[in-house]
């Protein structure tokens, strides 16, 4: 084989001309202490607050949290067991971001956007920072569109609007998560994308919820973000912000999104743990001084944008667990003051069989009334006051031997209306069905029925109306109001059904 000197020269010249010397400066530091999900690092002098860093030897990511004079306190996002003293940490020159978009629908992911459901990698085209400034007053418009939960007691008495923040608060095992899951199930076909964020929940409980969402077809428009109780406090801390970023993607693209934070009590506990480990000074109940800001900066990101900015919305349903009904504790009062109302669930009502166990007197929606459809306003206008008065009268009636007819009539109707408010789990109702049922209740059609016949009457009435007068339901759905003509028609329909019902069941 003869070597051509000219050819060799040409190849060498090409290689030399293509050679580009690249000098890259990397800001690195050394781990001086590690444990409990926290690393102290020396040498990262130029690191930004909340900047992502990487532990070179293990590939684990971290978040620069405490910037001190001689070292940086880093919260480790993942397993810290393999990180040792002396390991190298390098800056990534970006703040923390998570994948967003429609590719996450139907998936179960951790707060970093990594899949947990075994369905392969998550497909995404965009990422968003987990911390983002809440939209200002100029970007917003008043809440004016309802977000139907499918629960009679909520949609009639404590209505929620798109863009609202409504707190669900109560003791453990009172049905807080059930209300949130029913709301997600009820968004089917309504163009609302849902994000369910599980913070510090048992993995088995989350698996049950995911399975229920799959069975009802709700996973098609839902993303589940999980930081289970077995995950480090650092992941539990960032979970709600990651879920919020995923919801914001839809809001800023002119769509409607709903995000459930289940629950923020455990989130505050995780933040307290991180803060104490980083030697931040403790305050009331050992929470750090900025625990109010922790939740306010998260919940303020829920908004209804005006048309100029796309008209999208992000509705937030934070959940808070109380201890022994104490809603005046530190975290509950903080979140009550941040949100636009609360749904208060009471163990006493729950164990008495009143489910959802909503305490109507203590629950309120500060902005949702404007979003309620006219038909529901017409039907449920005085319902909250009537039921609150009934509960007082019922307490008083326990001590009275004789009651005047007017008081007795009010108690009779109140008992039947309370029975009407009961609803089994995972069976949300369409708003037009709710209007028909509540119309029958407030107009006294149930007053002469025994309480145990109310459920059968409700089911029978809906079946009867759907079979024979479905056009009436269609009209309520499309016009969103009860015209005088439809009111008269509804009276006639209910009377017709009641005659049949009494014949079948007797009084």
Curated annotation (Swiss-Prot):
Its EC number is 7.1.2.2. The record marks 363 as: Required for activity. It comes from the Bacteria. It catalyses: ATP + H2O + 4 H(+)(in) = ADP + phosphate + 5 H(+)(out). Its main location: membrane. It is a peripheral membrane protein. It is an enzyme of class 7 (translocase). The keyword Zinc does not apply. It is found in: Cell inner membrane. F-type ATPases have 2 components, CF(1) - the catalytic core - and CF(0) - the membrane proton channel. CF(1) has five subunits: alpha(3), beta(3), gamma(1), delta(1), epsilon(1). CF(0) has three main subunits: a(1), b(2) and c(9-12). The alpha and beta chains form an alternating ring which encloses part of the gamma chain. CF(1) is attached to CF(0) by a central stalk formed by the gamma and epsilon chains, while a peripheral stalk is formed by the delta and b chains. Produces ATP from ADP in the presence of a proton gradient across the membrane. The alpha chain is a regulatory subunit. Keywords: ATP synthesis, ATP-binding, Cell inner membrane, Cell membrane, CF(1), Hydrogen ion transport, Ion transport, Membrane, Nucleotide-binding, Translocase, Transport. Belongs to the ATPase alpha/beta chains family. PANTHER family: ATP SYNTHASE SUBUNIT ALPHA, MITOCHONDRIAL. This is ATP synthase subunit alpha. The keyword Membrane applies. GO terms for cellular component: plasma membrane; proton-transporting ATP synthase complex. ATP binds at residues 170-177. One of its GO terms (molecular function) is proton-transporting ATP synthase activity, rotational mechanism. Gene3D superfamilies: 2.40.30.20, ATP synthase alpha/beta chain, C-terminal domain, P-loop containing nucleotide triphosphate hydrolases.
């Amino acid at each position: 084989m003869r070597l051509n000197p000219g050819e060799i020269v040409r190849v060498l010249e090409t290689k030399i001309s293509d050679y580009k010397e690249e000098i890259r400066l990397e800001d690195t530091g050394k781990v001086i202490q590690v444990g409990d999900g926290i690393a102290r690092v020396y040498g990262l002098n130029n690191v930004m607050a909340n900047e992502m860093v990487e532990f070179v030897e293990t590939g684990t990511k971290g978040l620069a949290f405490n910037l001190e004079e001689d070292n940086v306190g880093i919260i480790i996002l993942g397993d810290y067991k393999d990180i040792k003293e002396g390991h190298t940490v390098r800056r990534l020159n970006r703040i923390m971001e998570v994948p967003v978009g429609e590719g996450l629908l139907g998936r179960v992911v951790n707060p970093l956007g990594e899949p947990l459901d075994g369905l392969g990698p998550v497909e995404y085209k965009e990422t968003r920072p987990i911390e983002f400034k809440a939209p200002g007053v100029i970007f917003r418009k008043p809440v004016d569109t309802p977000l139907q939960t499918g629960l009679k007691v909520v949609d009639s008495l404590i209505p929620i609007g798109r863009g609202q923040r409504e707190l669900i608060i109560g003791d453990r095992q009172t049905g807080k998560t059930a209300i949130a899951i029913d709301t997600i199930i009820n968004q089917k076909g309504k163009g609302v994308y849902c994000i369910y964020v599980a913070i510090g929940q048992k993995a088995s409980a989350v698996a049950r919820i995911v399975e229920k969402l799959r069975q009802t077809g709700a996973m098609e428009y839902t993303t589940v973000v999980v930081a289970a109780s077995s995950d480090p406090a650092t992941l539990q801390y960032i979970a709600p912000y990651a879920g919020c970023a995923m919801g914001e993607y839809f809001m800023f693209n002119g769509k409607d999104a709903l995000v459930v934070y289940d629950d923020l009590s455990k989130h505050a506990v995780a933040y307290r743990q991180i803060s104490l480990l980083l030697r931040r000074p403790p305050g009331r109940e050992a929470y750090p001084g900025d625990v109010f800001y922790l939740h306010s900066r998260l919940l303020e990101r829920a908004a209804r944008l005006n048309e100029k900015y796309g008209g999208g919305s992000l509705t937030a349903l934070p959940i808070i667990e109380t201890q022994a009904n104490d809603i005046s504790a530190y975290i509950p009062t903080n979140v009550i003051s941040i949100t636009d109302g609360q749904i208060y669930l009471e163990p006493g009502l729950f164990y008495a069989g009143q489910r959802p166990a909503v305490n109507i007197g203590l629950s309120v929606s500060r902005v949702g009334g404007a979003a309620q459809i006219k038909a529901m306003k017409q039907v449920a206008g005085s319902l909250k006051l009537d039921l609150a008065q009934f509960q007082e009268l019922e307490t008083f009636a326990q001590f009275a031997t004789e009651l005047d007819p007017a008081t007795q009539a009010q108690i009779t109707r109140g008992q039947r209306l309370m029975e009407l408010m009961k609803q089994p789990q995972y069976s949300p109702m369409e708003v037009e069905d709710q209007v028909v049922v509540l119309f029958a209740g407030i107009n006294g059609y149930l007053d002469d029925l025994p309480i145990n016949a109310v459920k059968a009457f409700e089911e029978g009435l809906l079946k009867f109306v759907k079979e024979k007068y479905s056009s009436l339901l269609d009209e309520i759905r499309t016009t969103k109001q009860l015209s005088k003509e439809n009111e008269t028609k509804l009276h006639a329909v209910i009377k017709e059904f009641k005659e049949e019902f009494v014949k079948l069941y007797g009084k």
